[in-house]
């Protein structure tokens, strides 16, 4: 069961990455880890650094993928963003531009992916 969830998550991240590239985002990393957790995707949207959380669900029996973006998870994303910015500083490549947190929710309905893209999500 856990392997199924991991495979679904990997599929969702790949699907989201392809979607973002079609929109013109430049993907620079995936699966970035630190002690606070993992950032699914990191990209540039023109001159803005964006970290992207991807949530993928099969059906809506336990709520939609979008509903799984709880306040606690959004606050964790804010910590992850700060950790990533600090890692850039430590690597002597500080980011001085704009940044934001996006979320992509993918719900499979009858095998068809339904994607919602939330830009600049609130952490409050």
From Swiss-Prot:
Q: Entry's Gene3D superfamilies? A: 3.40.1350.10
- Per its UniProt record, what InterPro entries does this chain match? Restrct_endonuc-II-like, tRNA_endonuc-like_dom_sf, UPF0102_YraN-like
Q: Where are the transmembrane segments?
A: none
Protein name listed in UniProt: UPF0102 protein Haur_0145
Select a single GO molecular function from the record's annotations and give it. Answer: nucleic acid binding
Disulfide-linked positions: none
Report the superkingdom from the record.
Bacteria
Which family would the database say this protein is a member of? Belongs to the UPF0102 family.
């Amino acid at each position: 069961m856990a392997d199924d969830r991991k495979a679904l998550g990997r599929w969702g991240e790949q699907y989201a990455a392809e979607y973002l590239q079609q929109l013109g985002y430049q993907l620079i990393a995936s699966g970035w880890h630190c002690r606070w957790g993992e950032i699914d995707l990191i990209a540039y949207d023109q001159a803005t650094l964006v970290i992207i959380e991807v949530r993928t669900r099969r059906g809506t029996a336990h709520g939609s993928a979008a509903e799984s973006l709880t306040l606690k998870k959004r606050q964790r994303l804010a910590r992850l963003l700060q950790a990533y910015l600090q890692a850039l500083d430590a690597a002597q490549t500080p980011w001085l531009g704009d940044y934001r947190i996006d979320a992509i929710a993918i719900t499979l309905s009858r095998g068809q992916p339904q994607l919602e893209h939330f830009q600049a999500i609130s952490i409050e």
